[in-house]
Amino acid sequence: MDGWCERHTGQAFDEGGRWAATGRIDVALLQRLLEEPFFAKAPPKSTGRDLLHLPWLEQALRSEHAERVGQAGLPSAWAPQDVQATLAELTACCAATDLRRHAPLTTRLLVCGGGAFNQHLMERLAQCLPGVTVSTTDRHGVPPDQVEALAFAWLARAYVAGLPGNLPAVTGARGPRVLGAWYPG
């Protein structure tokens, strides 16, 4: 979302999701984006701009355009804000689908990182997850933009204390392991 936003608005991100909120979700494009094999993988999983970058999006747009050229009545070009709205929906749909599939008893979702500041995305998550309370980590005393730093601080503390920093059921490791190294300078 950030790369698309920067290309079309000159802003580094869609502040509050206001730009995405002005667009319309393109369901056919959304389905095309969901064909990415990463989305079908079971957790734990993580990705970012290493996979979901502008060239990936542009390829999906080209593929969808080629398919639409032969179909009457379907637009073959997109308003940039419609693509942004579709990317926000992709994010919300994927999170909601994985949560329902792999953690169906979830009643509360705490969002952190940049998405926690995107009101449009937060609203889409809430709509995609009826019965689940969607809020930010801030409501629980942890600023959303500090969660990653706190996680690394926790890992450092575990290392210093000689405690395992992994969960084998999550990481796939053969057992608990002390993570990291100390290189005094």
Can you name each region flagged by the protein language model?
Residues 1-14, 178:
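Phosphate-binding/catalytic loop of phosphoryl-transfer enzymes
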Residues 1-2, 14, 20, 40, ...:
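Generic, ordered loop/turn and secondary-structure boundary motif
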Residues 3-9, 93-173:
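Catalytic phosphate/nucleotide-handling subdomain of diverse soluble enzymes
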Residues 11-13, 17-108, 119-132:
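A contiguous, well-structured pocket-lining segment that forms one wall/lid of small-molecule binding clefts
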Residues 45-62, 85, 138, 161-164, ...:
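Glycine/Thr-rich phosphate-binding loops that ligate phosphate moieties of nucleotide
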